[in-house]
């Protein structure tokens, strides 16, 4: 079992506008540290002494980095922080201090390195604060990272900050038929001595249906294959590549059962259907791989030294 803690706007006294500002500006609000302290104290008490509880995810898919730094709401952007209104002056002043400390005269001369250094500082501040708070109340369970998603998981500064403070780096892994070799090689370097976990992945199949009507399968990040057997083949191939890296400690298939989106359209994410009927052709492939994990680990260990 794992538990997730999140950056929310409950400590602000007003609703935060995700469509105007990057959520990570909330890190610098005067009440944030107190809010996190109360939240961790409350959640950690639920699992005190629980030997079956693995640990905590700090959050889910935080907006550390966006594709090609194109969206300041989905990725930390120095200019975005510098332009924040008075309501978020603490985050703006943090960015202004960064500019002064690095001798950057104006936004017009901000370099790519400046941008990445600032992203790394914000990520470091986040992970240092949150992990220290967790350890204040819970020293027995693991801190499982923040389920990095999209371009955040490909960013060196972000991954390194996570690995510096968390017990492992967790990534939600979509939009690929199999793990990319260059990304896995980067993770081995960026994570250092820390392992990584694939905290979310799945694939959907076109043959899923409810009472004779095929699923819409339009919701979610997982791609689409033809059959449940193909889902099983995807699962085996994906997980074999993870085992081959030798620094992946596991994966979490998302999710247990099929479900509906907000418009009532079904999506084939589960290992069982909406009616809780198991997808046997998918599960047989999953079972075959899962029961072979330890022998496969031995195989890849031996192969790595040959």
Model-derived regions, located:
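Glycoside hydrolase catalytic-domain groove-lining segments
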Residues: 108, 117-132, 136-220, 236-240
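Substrate-binding cleft of secreted/luminal carbohydrate-active enzymes
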Residues: 53-54, 60, 199-201, 218-272
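Polysaccharide-binding and catalytic clefts of secreted carbohydrate-active enzymes
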Residues: 27, 50-140, 145-157
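Ligand-binding grooves and catalytic loops that recognize ribose/phosphate and carbohydrate rings
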Residues: 15-47, 187-188, 209-248
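Active-site beta-loop-alpha junctions enriched in small/polar residues
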Residues: 11, 59-63, 148-151, 174, ...
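Short, solvent-exposed loop/turn and secondary-structure capping segments
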Residues: 66-72, 181-182, 208-210, 263-264
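Short, small-residue-biased leader/transition segments that mark boundaries at the very start
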Residues: 2-7
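Aromatic-rich peripheral "rim/lid" segments of glycoside hydrolase catalytic domains that contact
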Residues: 73-85, 254-306
